[in-house]
């Protein structure tokens, strides 16, 4: 009886590393007010080399439509989507030899975690071509051990575009959202 109870406890602890709260780290920045005509075109440099990138663009397209934006070939707004999937246990620095600064810190593995985390990151940028300025930039990222980037994308798109058409600001707004799901 006691042995069975211990097996149940150990099994529950092992599985606990797979499901639980997922933090979506969000950074959004409305640099200039949106244009009245909310037509947009896709950046010609966005690669559609795989189905995850194609899915990201499709989800961004749908959410922009819900926010009143319409795709048009001669639109003033240019939309760029960047998608990344990388090992989370490496840090990313930027700069030259004298001014190196950390962009992303390495993530430590949780106790009882049986696999290594990956970071799923989506960045969506809107440029006002008529004014020659960046209109909006939003990024969202999550750590996952077992979840796929395709499973993360609906949440990443919603988070990355959460500040679109908000108040303009000189500094980006950083927030963290928490949801339940497969880590």
Q: Where on the chain are the PLM-derived regions?
A:
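A structural "domain/chain start" motif
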Residues: 2, 16-67, 170-183
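Second-shell loop/turn segments in exported
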Residues: 43-51, 68, 110-112, 140-147
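A short, structured loop/turn motif at beta-sheet edges
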Residues: 34-38, 71-77, 126-133
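C-terminal/domain-edge helix-coil "capping" segments
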Residues: 19-31, 119-121, 128-137, 141-183
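Bacterial N-terminal signal peptides
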Residues: 5-16
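Short, intrinsically disordered, charge-biased short linear motifs at domain edges
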Residues: 2-5, 132
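Acidic helix-start/capping segments at beta-turn-to-alpha-helix junctions
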Residues: 72-90, 176-181
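Surface-exposed short loop/turn segments
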Residues: 67, 81-137, 167
């Amino acid at each position: 009886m006691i042995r069975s109870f211990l097996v149940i406890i150990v099994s529950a602890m092992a599985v606990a590393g797979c499901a639980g709260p997922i933090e979506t780290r969000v950074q959004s920045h409305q640099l200039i007010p949106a244009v009245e005509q909310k037509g947009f075109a896709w950046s010609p440099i966005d690669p559609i080399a795989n189905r995850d990138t194609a899915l990201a663009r499709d989800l961004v397209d749908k959410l922009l439509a819900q926010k009143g934006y319409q795709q048009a070939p001669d639109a003033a707004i240019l939309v760029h989507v960047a998608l990344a999937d990388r090992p989370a246990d490496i840090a990313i620095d930027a700069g030259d030899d004298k001014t190196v600064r950390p962009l992303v810190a390495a993530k430590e593995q949780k106790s009882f975690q049986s696999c290594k985390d990956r970071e799923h990151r989506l960045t969506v940028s809107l440029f006002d071509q008529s004014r020659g300025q960046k209109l909006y930039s939003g990024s969202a990222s999550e750590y996952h051990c077992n979840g796929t980037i395709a499973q993360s994308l609906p949440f990443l798109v919603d988070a990355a575009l959460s500040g679109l058409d908000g108040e303009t600001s000189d500094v980006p707004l950083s927030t963290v959202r928490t949801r339940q799901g497969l880590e």
